Amino acid sequence: IRHKYAHKSGEGVMIGELPERVIDKGIPSASLLSMLLTNKYLDHLPLYRQKQRFARDGIEIASSTIEGWGKQALGKLEPLYESLVLDTKSQGYLQVDETTIKVLDKDKKGACHLGYYWVYHNPMDKTVLFDYQPTRAARSAAHILDNFRGYLQTDGYAGYEQYGKKEGVTHLACWAHARREFEKALDNDRERAEFALFSIQKLYAIERYAKENNLEPEAIKELRLKESLPVIN
């Protein structure tokens, strides 16, 4: 609502300026757009169901309109996404893993194909980046890892090797994944497998102590050198 005010003198009319719009020449407010995206991506409520809910309240919105709002709202979030990518990479320590996700195939009604979430975690400031890619091929991580320098922690998937060998990158393994192999070895060589599992359990206890006491990164490093390194050696 924009109120108009006329001067008592009769000299002209004053009207408030329109608020800045999120979408150029569009009517949805920032709160409406954030609701649409939250409902869809956090609460798993597709846009067509949101359209039906609006209709029950007597608000008719064309499918093309609400879909256009969603698309343009996502475009407005791109600077935030780029900032998240930068923040996630900037500390020089990344933990990376990839996992499957079923994706609806727009060319085949009702059909799905298998896509991948590549997940990047920065343990220093706890930022997490979910990056969808249609494949598990190593090239899927190129836009994130090609210019990354620092500590890169992954499982044993061969796709990470080319990034771990880059200059300025120290490739770290993962004890959780390594532990699985010793569990598998219990049936073949129980004594040595149990020794390895017991040793890894000691490492976990040290990490638990660091977490429970909220140790700073430098203090964690000193703790690992003092307590964890002898266990590994």
Task: Show the residue positions of the predicted features.
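Catalytic center-proximal scaffold of phosphoryl-transfer enzymes
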Residues: 2-6, 11-233
